[in-house]
Curated annotation (Swiss-Prot):
Pathway(s) annotated for this protein in UniProt: Glycolipid biosynthesis; lipid IV(A) biosynthesis; lipid IV(A) from (3R)-3-hydroxytetradecanoyl-[acyl-carrier-protein] and UDP-N-acetyl-alpha-D-glucosamine: step 1/6
Keyword tRNA-binding: no
Entry keywords, A to Z: Acyltransferase, Cytoplasm, Lipid A biosynthesis, Lipid biosynthesis, Lipid metabolism, Repeat, Transferase
Protein's UniProt name: Acyl-[acyl-carrier-protein]--UDP-N-acetylglucosamine O-acyltransferase
MF (Gene Ontology): acyl-[acyl-carrier-protein]-UDP-N-acetylglucosamine O-acyltransferase activity
Any GO BP annotation: lipid A biosynthetic process
Amino acids binding substrate: Q69, D70, L71, K72, H121, H140, Q157
GO CC terms of this entry: cytoplasm; membrane
Main function: Involved in the biosynthesis of lipid A, a phosphorylated glycolipid that anchors the lipopolysaccharide to the outer membrane of the cell.
Gene3D superfamilies for this protein: Hexapeptide repeat proteins, Udp N-acetylglucosamine O-acyltransferase, C-terminal domain
Quaternary structure, from the entry: Homotrimer.
InterPro entries to which the protein is assigned, alphabetical: Acetyltransf_C (IPR029098), Acetyltransf_C_sf (IPR037157), Hexapep (IPR001451), Lipid_A_LpxA (IPR010137), Trimer_LpxA-like_sf (IPR011004)
Pfam families: Acetyltransf_11, Hexapep
């Protein structure tokens, strides 16, 4: 049975599943759908065509599904789809998609979005991610699974961050980040590999292989793209080579890599 505060304002067109809790002074618009076990604390606003998955908890003053902050948006149909078991903390803002993107913003499962996180239109966030306080995502950003982003970090539109990456706090990131990399700075560059996450997700032999692969890729000569092409030719059947090198070759913004920055950090770690 759902538990709904008397002061909540809920459209009769909204779909509220069983076991949902809606706190005082929440506002729920026409196209909103709340799956089982969703919990809204007080003063949450949900608008637009917004779906919130099972057992997701949204804290006070979060605003989800309002019109995207894009001057090209003219009221066309778009969606915000949020998966299961997410924690969305105070004052978060998440916008739906636009006609100029994929027409939806997607958030996976088991993510933590801390206070004041902003997720702009057409972003795609995987699962098991942590976005710390004040992280700002511009439009069309793609974030893979198991990514951690430190507080007060700003990320440029269309940037792609692959699985298992760590972005240090107060960074300004304008380029793509391949799998398992650690990035820091303004402008942010790759400083090394995310050892902690790799140990959680991979076997030791696979970690060793990925380390060796990145050392080959990040040599000054040949270029990063040429190195990625060579690796794909020589190790076409290796899944890690496919994942990492294909990501590099598909990058439209370029990779956040500078030889001097990566090598200095790796030498310190070694």
């Amino acid at each position: 049975m759902s538990k709904i505060a008397k002061t909540a304002i809920i459209s009769p067109k909204a779909e509220i599943n069983k076991g949902v809790e809606i706190g005082e002074f929440c506002v729920i618009g026409d196209g909103v759908k709340l799956d089982e076990g969703v919990k809204l604390h007080n003063n949450v606003t949900l608008q637009g065509h917004t779906f919130v998955g099972k057992n997701t908890e949204i804290f006070p003053f979060a605003v989800l599904g309002t019109q995207p902050q894009d001057l090209k948006y003219k009221g066309e149909y778009s969606e915000l789809i949020i998966g299961e078991d997410n924690l969305i903390r105070e004052f978060c803002m998440i916008n739906p998609g636009t006609e100029g993107g994929i027409k939806k913003t997607l958030i996976g499962d088991k993510n933590l979005l801390m206070a004041y996180v902003h997720v702009a239109h057409d972003c795609v966030i995987g699962s098991h991610c942590i976005l710390a306080n004040g992280v700002t995502l511009a439009g069309h950003i793609e974030i893979g699974d198991y990514v951690n982003i430190g507080g007060l970090t700003a990320i440029h539109q269309f940037v792609r961050i692959a699985k298992g990456c760590m972005i240090a706090g107060k960074s300004a990131l304008g380029k793509d980040v391949p799998p398992y990399c650690t990035v820091e700075g303004n402008r942010a560059f790759i400083r090394g590999l995310n050892r902690h996450r790799m140990r959680q997700l991979l076997e030791s032999k696979d970690i060793d292989f990925i380390y060796a692969l990145y050392k080959r890729l990040f040599r000054p000569i040949p270029s990063l793209r040429e190195s990625a092409k060579l690796e794909l030719e020589e190790h076409a059947n290796n899944p890690f080579v496919k994942e990492i090198c294909s990501f590099i070759l598909e990058s439209s913004r370029g990779v956040a890599y500078k030889s001097s920055e990566y090598s200095s950090e790796e030498k310190q770690e070694e």
